[in-house]
Curated annotation (Swiss-Prot):
Stated name of the protein: Acetyl-coenzyme A carboxylase carboxyl transferase subunit beta
Family per record: Belongs to the AccD/PCCB family.
Matches recorded under HAMAP family: AcetylCoA_CT_beta
Natural source organism: Ligilactobacillus salivarius (strain UCC118) (Lactobacillus salivarius)
Subunit architecture: Acetyl-CoA carboxylase is a heterohexamer composed of biotin carboxyl carrier protein (AccB), biotin carboxylase (AccC) and two subunits each of ACCase subunit alpha (AccA) and ACCase subunit beta (AccD).
Domain of life from the UniProt record: Bacteria
Cellular location(s): Cytoplasm
Reactions listed under catalytic activity: N(6)-carboxybiotinyl-L-lysyl-[protein] + acetyl-CoA = N(6)-biotinyl-L-lysyl-[protein] + malonyl-CoA
Keyword Transferase: yes
Length: 283
């Protein structure tokens, strides 16, 4: 009995010691990949914030992506102000918080960028700005991006990340789909290149409009791409669908996108694509 009492005492001391040590360990050191479920030490994500196992690109702010994507950037339309046309409960507070967190006036960052002396119009959607939803200012900024690109004879590269149209703005947000699509059409009629890069997640009205209108449609690995979410689909058709139904790899196999591109390769390959399509007489 004495032996068991000693073991109990040792165990209690060990538990207390571990508990104290555990309290000093900061949170966020280990992150679980939402796609492959592998536990990742936070520093192993690197500057690109990608899973070293399956190459899934973790969701990042638009300005964070900008830091490693381009050499120079001139931002446009920072003065546009999002309104609350429906006086939707809590919308103003959500906007203020999203603007403070993202340092954007709405869910997309737009401007003129350069990589290796290649100039192009660039748009980057922010998945953390009210789920990257598309409101009237988002639509206006993207429309102006294409209009400027058409005037300046520039290609457009647009990184999409969105939960769809912003419900707090009602029908006005849905109207942005046709508004942007018209600007995309005019840009295309001018014989200019449009590249979309799908990032996680790209859904709803953004998928149903400008995200899938690119001349070249690329995607990051394991990005979710679809119109309705998996749960909505299952409730509609009353049957289970595969977990990877809307993964970029499945969408690629079915011919809806052209290629999958890792984050560390994006700067070089996007510049190369713009260069070869700007060569006179290349095709």
């Amino acid at each position: 009995m004495q032996l068991f009492d000693e073991l109990k005492t040792i165990s209690k001391k060990h538990i207390k010691a571990n508990k104290k040590a555990g309290e000093k360990v900061p949170s966020g050191l280990w992150i679980s990949c939402p796609k492959c479920q592998q536990s990742i030490y936070h520093k192993d994500l690197g500057k690109y914030k990608t899973c070293p196992n399956c190459y899934y690109g973790f969701r990042i702010h638009a300005r964070e992506r900008l830091e490693w994507l381009v050499d120079t950037f001139q931002e446009f339309d920072t003065d546009l102000e999002t309104k609350d046309p429906l006086n939707f409960p809590g919308y103003k507070e959500k906007l203020i918080k999203a603007q403070q967190d993202s340092k954007l006036n709405d869910s997309v960052l737009t401007g003129i960028a350069m990589i290796d002396d290649v100039e192009f119009a660039l748009g980057i959607m922010d998945p953390y700005f009210i789920m990257g939803s598309m409101g009237t200012v988002t639509g206006e900024k993207i429309t102006r991006l294409f209009e400027r690109a058409t005037q300046k004879n520039l290609p457009v590269i647009l990184f999409t990340a969105s939960g769809g149209a912003r419900m707090q703005e009602g029908i006005s947000s849905l109207m942005q789909m046709s508004k942007i699509s018209q600007a995309v059409k005019e840009h295309s009629n001018a014989g200019l290149l449009y590249i979309t890069v799908i990032t996680d997640p790209t859904t709803g009205g953004v998928t149903a409009s400008f995200a899938m209108q690119g001349d070249i449609i690329l995607s990051e690995p394991r990005a979710l791409l679809g119109f309705a979410g998996k749960r909505v689909i299952e409730q509609t058709i009353h049957q289970k669908v595969p977990d990877d139904l809307q993964d970029a790899e499945t969408v690629l196999k079915n011919g809806f996108i052209d290629n999958i591109i890792k984050r560390e390769d994006q700067k070089e390959k996007l510049a190369w694509l713009v260069k070869i399509h700007s060569m006179k007489g290349a095709f």
